[in-house]
Amino acid sequence: MQQSIWVNGLNRKIKLQIRKMNLKKKLFILVFILLNIYGLLCGVIYFFQENLIFMPSVLSQEHVFEMKSSFDEINLKSSDGAHLNGLYFKKENSKGVVLYFHGNAGNLKDWGQIADLFVDLDYDVLIMDYRGYGKSKGEKSMEFLYEDAELWYEFVQQNYSESKIIVYGRSIGTTFAAYVAAKHGPNKLILEAPFYSMLAIAKSRFSFLPIRYLLDYKFPTYQFMDDINCPVIFYHGTYDKVIPYDQGKKLYDSFNTDKKELITIPMGGHNNLNSFKEYTESIRLEL
């Protein structure tokens, strides 16, 4: 009888040990899977960041643009030999020129239509495609993109005094617009749906990842603001799901000057501000 009790007790101990071992094994497997998922997410962010940030459409070099307003096609070569393509719209007896940096998707086939707004307000317009967009070619890097923005500004500067230059940036283009405005002295800077930095946006979306060490395209727009001396107009919609309103407000608040204005568009999204009266009336007044 005693031997039977001893055997039963031993069996219970063995079963308990097996359960503990199985639990440890399951926990180990779970941790292993979670670490692999975490590593995979880090890898996706690091290796595919260009695909997440830039959404270009490519055009053949033979593509013929068709626009409502008359234009010339401009081609520049960067310091590293990249081919850069832009459209230059000219208005007779213009008041000046709008240098326009567009958003992160599409190409000049679509973005060229935006020139009509400014041409109707008696401005010339120069709008370009970034590397890998439309007919523009070349290896991307944050440094190259800022250098390209500078090259386009210098092109405009050959034909206009800075008092006649309006720099306009939209979405990702706001960081390039702020960059050239900080290095030069245009008449005015207009930022539509701007962001504090790409790093700040990425952190807000992937707060559980070491984004600072993964992101090459940090685009620190805020770093340029203190060197800007011209008036700056900010436009941002409260329903912007791509670049949240608080990103634009944070950039606005970081700009220590009395030559700034924030136009908040209630219910405005990321791609429809030009359909709101607050935007169109303000643009006409500013230009």
Task: Place the predicted regions along the sequence by residue.
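Short alpha-helix in the alpha/beta-hydrolase fold that links the catalytic acid
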Residues: I114, T221, C230, P244-D253
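Short beta-strand/loop motif that positions the catalytic acidic residue
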Residues: I228, F234-H236, D240
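Acidic catalytic loop of the alpha/beta-hydrolase fold
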Residues: Y239-I243, H270-N271
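Membrane-embedded segments
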Residues: S79-V156, R170, T174-T175
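An N-terminal hydrophobic leader/cap segment in hydrolases
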Residues: K26, L30, L35-K77
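C-terminal catalytic histidine-bearing segment of alpha/beta-hydrolase fold enzymes
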Residues: K250, S254-L287
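Mobile cap/lid helix-loop segments that gate and shape the active-site cleft of serine hydrolases
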Residues: S197-C230
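Primarily recognizes the serine-hydrolase "nucleophile elbow" in alpha/beta-hydrolase
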Residues: E154-Q158, E162-F208
